[in-house]
Every structure is written in structure tokens, then in C-alpha cells.
Amino acid sequence: MIEILLDPFRYDFMIRSLITAFASGAMLSLLGPFTINRNMGFMADAMAHATLPIIAVGVFLGFSISELGVPAAILIAIFLGLIIKNTNVGEDTAIGIIFSSFFALGFVLISLLNVTVNLEDLLFGQILAVNISDVYIVVSLLILVILVTVTYFKQLLFYSFDPIGAEVKGLNTTFLNYLFLILLSIAIVGSLQTVGIILVLSMLIIPAAAAKLVTETFTASIGVSVLFGTISSITGLYLSYFLNLPSGPSMSLVATTIFVIAFLSKKIRKKGSLATVTVS
């Protein structure tokens, strides 16, 4: 058993991939509970798709996806925030417009600029292709997300549950909103090479949703979400290695399996509690 677990460590590319998978899984699942609490799943998906034109231009200029992380995240977060704030068509409608138009623009730019990029890797991730520079960047982004989240945890928590109350209390809600959007964009862009544009939402939402089913408090759900997210990433990568499966979809399916187990576990516990009450 130990030999099986250690086998991937014989290869440098697998060591890089495992570190990146852990960092991406932790980064996304850390922000997942906040995203669910604020009903921002659709927004997060739009952010992922909005990265495509930036990636197209960046790759054309000679940058890697990881190197585009922070500047792309800031641009996307600010742009989305401004569009939603200054339009009267409704938040979901504005996000839907951004989602589809930016995704379409990305493919047009890839064609016009004659960018050499593997679309399957872009959409579903190709973690096995990460280099040492990508590893340093993704780990640095994880540290940045953790530090900022810990520093502003109480404010983000208050704003997440009660935006109006936070504003009444004197918190700068505009700053907190853009701060979270930037953190979310950083996590998404930093994880694109791991799970791709299509599946990044699954690694953001599913571990957090599973954690919500098995915990009683929001703070506890964050810790459990990170645990589920990292387990999903590492286990998915192991499955990819031993069964020759695509890494991104494997991670997503492991996360889904954890969610199903958590869901069934809660149902069983609930039935057990009702049976105990009935007998009493």
C-alpha cells in the first residue's frame, strides 16, 4: 500500500502536479463556503469563462496561464463588479451576458491571433504539464489567499451573512465586495491549469456543499471544505495516474462522490434521530 502511494513521487512531473493539485484544491475550497453563502456560484462560473480572452492575449504575448493569474484576476473582478453595479438589467442577466460574450470573444481571439493552445487542456485542465515556475506561482497565490482571508475574516464573514447590517455597522462593503471578487478570481485563474475553465466551478462549490452537510457552523464548514477539496484533488490525481484518466474530471468526480456520501450520511443520521424520537 505504501509503495503504491509513493510510486508517483518517482517522477518530478508528478511531484509538481501533486503540489499544484493540493494548492489549487485548498485555495478553491477555502473560498467555497463564502461563495455558496453569497449565492455567487454563477458569478464564479462567469469569472472562469471570462478568463479565456485574457489567456488568449497572454499566450500570444508569451505568458503562461499561471503568470497571468494576479493581473487577470484583478481585471476580471473589477470589470465584473463595475458591470453588475452599473447596469439595470439584473445581476444574473449581466453575469449571463458577460459569461457568453467573453467566452465567445476568447475563441475569436484564439483564431485571430493564431494562438497555439490545446483547447481540451484549457477547458478541462492539464496539471501534468505544470513546470516549476507554475508550482511557485500557484503556491504563492494560495499563501496570498490564506493571508488575506485570515486578515479580513471577521469582516468578510459579517458581510457574507448580512451585507446591509455590515454597511450599517460602518464596514466598507464596497471594498469587501471587490476584495472577495479579487480573491475568488485569483483562486479561479490560479487553478485553471489544474481543472480547466469548465470544471473549476465544481472544485469551488462541491467540497463546500459537502462540508455544509456535515458541519454545524460556518467556521467548521471552511475547515472541512478545505479537507474535502484537497482530498478530491490529490485522490483525483492518483486516479488519473494509475488509471490513465484525465486529471481535472477525475478530481471533480471524487469531489462529487464525497458530496454523495455526505448527503446520504446526513439522510441516515436524520432518519436515525427521528426513529429515536418516535421510540421515546
Predicted regions and their residues:
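Short loop segments and helix-boundary regions at transmembrane helix junctions
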Residues: 33-115, 212-223, 240-243, 267-268
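Membrane-helix/interface signature in polytopic inner-membrane proteins
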Residues: 147-180
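Transmembrane alpha-helical segments in multi-pass inner-membrane proteins
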Residues: 198-249
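Loop-to-helix entry region at the N-terminal start of transmembrane alpha-helices
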Residues: 13-20, 119-146
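Membrane-interface helix termini and inter-helical loops of multi-pass transporters
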Residues: 2-11, 116-130, 238-241
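Membrane-interfacial amphipathic/re-entrant helices at transmembrane-helix boundaries
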Residues: 1-26, 273-276
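Loop-to-transmembrane alpha-helix initiation sites
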Residues: 17, 66-73, 92-96, 139, ...
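Cytosolic-side transmembrane-helix boundaries in multi-pass membrane proteins
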Residues: 245-252, 256-280
